[in-house]
């Protein structure tokens, strides 16, 4: 996560937990119209897989978080708030999340080149908390990746094992902010990809 994403997660995580969900991570993206703040929420790990995040859950969290952000104002200028379930191809934001998905296949994008590349794909072998490394099995070779050098990481679902064909990523319309407003509208966009409903 970016520094801004970490700041927002630290601010919002207690609020989201009060609503009964875990805040997995946040993306803060600058766009011509302002910014997009995308939050990923999930059911607490102890309650999985019996329960899962619904569209109504995303909308409820979006409403509560939007009102809270209006008070705290951690973001200046216009922005759109999106709340999503993680989906099968979930983003991984923390070392704990990497450890939880041991032996899963992941795609990793790096800030700086490591092991001759800025893009790696392999299975999560283990997480070394001391030193902050994620060890991946890439083409039969174990590679230690510095967690602080990871820009983005995402699970690669085994679609064939799930009996599913991969879904194309759909584009989600977001509500535009008024041009003259410096503050976000309370009408934040709550979204959930179709892939997020299936576990």
Swiss-Prot record:
<dbReference type="InterPro" id="IPR028998">
    <property type="entry name" value="RimP_C"/>
</dbReference>
<dbReference type="InterPro" id="IPR003728">
    <property type="entry name" value="Ribosome_maturation_RimP"/>
</dbReference>
<dbReference type="InterPro" id="IPR036847">
    <property type="entry name" value="RimP_C_sf"/>
</dbReference>
<comment type="similarity">
    <text>Belongs to the RimP family.</text>
</comment>
<dbReference type="GO" id="GO:0000028">
    <property type="term" value="P:ribosomal small subunit assembly"/>
</dbReference>
<protein>
    <recommendedName>
        <fullName>Ribosome maturation factor RimP</fullName>
    </recommendedName>
</protein>
<keyword id="KW-0690">Ribosome biogenesis</keyword>
<comment type="function">
    <text>Required for maturation of 30S ribosomal subunits.</text>
</comment>
<dbReference type="GO" id="GO:0005829">
    <property type="term" value="C:cytosol"/>
</dbReference>
<feature type="region of interest" description="Disordered">
    <location>
        <begin position="170"/>
        <end position="199"/>
    </location>
</feature>
<dbReference type="InterPro" id="IPR035956">
    <property type="entry name" value="RimP_N_sf"/>
</dbReference>
<dbReference type="Pfam" id="PF02576">
    <property type="entry name" value="RimP_N"/>
</dbReference>
<dbReference type="Pfam" id="PF17384">
    <property type="entry name" value="DUF150_C"/>
</dbReference>
<dbReference type="GO" id="GO:0006412">
    <property type="term" value="P:translation"/>
</dbReference>
<keyword id="KW-0963">Cytoplasm</keyword>
<feature type="compositionally biased region" description="Polar residues">
    <location>
        <begin position="177"/>
        <end position="189"/>
    </location>
</feature>
<dbReference type="InterPro" id="IPR028989">
    <property type="entry name" value="RimP_N"/>
</dbReference>
